[in-house]
């Protein structure tokens, strides 16, 4: 039994897709366990970029199984579009498996997402308006429609009618909006279900059988720990659990079958949307990092907020997600800076704290306490060994590891697969 979970340790966009793609080379099954098409991940193969939102990164390996787990919420329209995109690019999808227990995002979820966000006014949480939150709301309220329901024409229509009756009351009476007619969406979405039917199965059986047979299984998280609904910067979070513990619920695999947790982070920090960000930069350095790092959302295209590396955030992520190994990405983005900073603690009302507060009011008053390190001017995008990094860059990498308290297994100096360098093989140490 060999299994590895890949989680983002910041607010998403840490390069999980790249690391998952890298680790997938030695895995036999790759599975996603939470989130939906609000999470974009970019894979670069031979200089060509592929952008995915639902399908696991392992789809580019035709000999491996890629799984959309039961903890995900699936927009069938987006999924069919993504499948068609892959087919047009010459990528086979015969190895895809979709959980029959995953919940379905429908047009009324997206409309409700939009209306709820608009109603918040200045208190918006920065949702991607993909219907993720409302779909998880229906799941928790036990009125959600699952993939298994979508495939049965009569059951799908019955449950769609029931849900539309409730949602339309909200649209018309609470939001003064237009009702959605069942005939406008039923046939379209039933047809999407028929197009994905060949991939649908009980994925928990596939995953557990693979682990019992000693196969290598890689679990791919979306978003990041700081967007986790329980452990993140609530309420500026997603509606699911990106932490490693989400694997057990979102894939149907017991916790005793998880061996290692790889935490993925950038050498700086970024965030899309609203919410606390203690190390955020508003100066020319921040603008430079954003441009050099191409910090624009894969899903939304929005400019990301950027800031210095925050070891307080990272230690929180390490603790709540049980991180055993670290993948440090985008070190090259910091090249050319005279000084680089790492947040080592916060100053809260004159008191030094080393943990991440739950209170948003306290977070607003937190001031980062920085440790400054000398920067480096060299182009490091061609570096393939740690010892070949400039001394100051090596010192930065080592200091990150010391402050987080986790050994670094890989470091990256660019977006391409061959720019990811191994310090310790995650698979061979199992």
Curated annotation (Swiss-Prot):
Its EC number is 6.3.4.4. Binds 1 Mg(2+) ion per subunit. Pathway: Purine metabolism; AMP biosynthesis via de novo pathway; AMP from IMP: step 1/2. Keywords: Cytoplasm, GTP-binding, Ligase, Magnesium, Metal-binding, Nucleotide-binding, Purine biosynthesis. GTP binds at residues 12-18, 40-42, 304, 330-332, 412-414. Its cofactor is Mg(2+). IMP binds at residues 13-16, 38-41, 128, 142, 223, 238, 302. Mg(2+) binds at residues 13, 40. GO terms for cellular component: cytoplasm. One of its GO terms (biological process) is 'de novo' AMP biosynthetic process. It is found in: Cytoplasm. GO terms for molecular function: adenylosuccinate synthase activity; GTP binding; magnesium ion binding. It catalyses: IMP + L-aspartate + GTP = N(6)-(1,2-dicarboxyethyl)-AMP + GDP + phosphate + 2 H(+). Substrate binds at residues 298-304. The active site is at 13 (proton acceptor), 41 (proton donor). Homodimer. PANTHER family: ADENYLOSUCCINATE SYNTHETASE (PTHR11846:SF0). Belongs to the adenylosuccinate synthetase family. Plays an important role in the de novo pathway of purine nucleotide biosynthesis. Catalyzes the first committed step in the biosynthesis of AMP from IMP. This is Adenylosuccinate synthetase. It comes from Streptococcus gordonii (strain Challis / ATCC 35105 / BCRC 15272 / CH1 / DL1 / V288).
């Amino acid at each position: 039994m060999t299994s590895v979970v890949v989680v983002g340790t910041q607010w998403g966009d840490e390069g999980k897709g790249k690391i998952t793609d890298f680790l997938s080379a030695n895995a036999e099954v790759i599975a996603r366990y939470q989130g939906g098409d609000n999470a974009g991940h970019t894979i670069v193969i031979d200089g060509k970029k592929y952008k995915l939102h639902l399908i696991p990164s392992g789809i580019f390996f035709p000999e491996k199984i890629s799984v959309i787990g039961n903890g995900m919420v699936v927009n069938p329209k987006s999924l069919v579009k993504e499948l068609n995109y892959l087919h047009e690019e010459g990528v086979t999808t015969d190895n895809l498996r979709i959980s029959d227990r995953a919940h379905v995002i429908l047009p009324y979820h997206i409309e409700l997402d939009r209306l709820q966000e608009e109603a918040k006014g200045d208190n918006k949480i920065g949702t991607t308006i993909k219907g993720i939150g409302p779909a998880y709301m229906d799941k928790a309220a036990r009125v959600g429609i699952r993939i298994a329901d979508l495939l049965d024409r009569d059951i799908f229509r019955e449950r769609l009618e029931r849900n539309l009756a409730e949602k339309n009351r909200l649209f018309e009476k609470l939001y003064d909006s237009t009702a959605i007619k069942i005939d406008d969406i039923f046939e379209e979405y039933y047809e999407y279900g028929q197009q994905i039917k060949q991939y649908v199965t009980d994925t928990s059986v596939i995953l557990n059988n693979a682990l019992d047979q000693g196969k290598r299984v890689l679990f791919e998280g979306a978003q990041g720990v700081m967007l986790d609904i329980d452990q993140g910067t609530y309420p500026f979070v997603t509606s699911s659990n990106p932490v490693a513990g989400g694997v057990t619920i979102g894939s149907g695999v017991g916790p005793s079958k998880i061996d290692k947790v790889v935490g993925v982070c950038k050498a700086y920090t970024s965030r899309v949307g609203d919410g606390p960000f203690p190390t955020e930069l508003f100066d020319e350095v921040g603008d430079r990092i954003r441009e050099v790092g191409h910090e624009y959302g894969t899903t939304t295209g929005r400019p990301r907020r950027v800031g210095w590396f925050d070891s307080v955030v990272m230690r929180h992520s390490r603790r709540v997600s049980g991180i055993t190994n670290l993948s440090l990405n985008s070190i090259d983005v910091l090249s050319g800076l005279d000084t680089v900073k790492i947040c080592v603690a916060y100053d809260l009302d004159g008191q030094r704290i080393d943990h991440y507060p739950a209170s948003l009011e306290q977070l607003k008053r937190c001031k980062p306490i920085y440790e400054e390190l000398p920067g480096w001017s060299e182009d490091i995008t061609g570096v393939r060994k740690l010892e070949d990094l400039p001394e100051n860059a090596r010192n930065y990498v080592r200091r990150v590891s010391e402050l987080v308290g986790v050994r670094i297994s890989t470091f990256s100096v660019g977006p391409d697969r061959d720019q990811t360098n191994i310090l310790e093989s995650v698979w061979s140490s199992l």
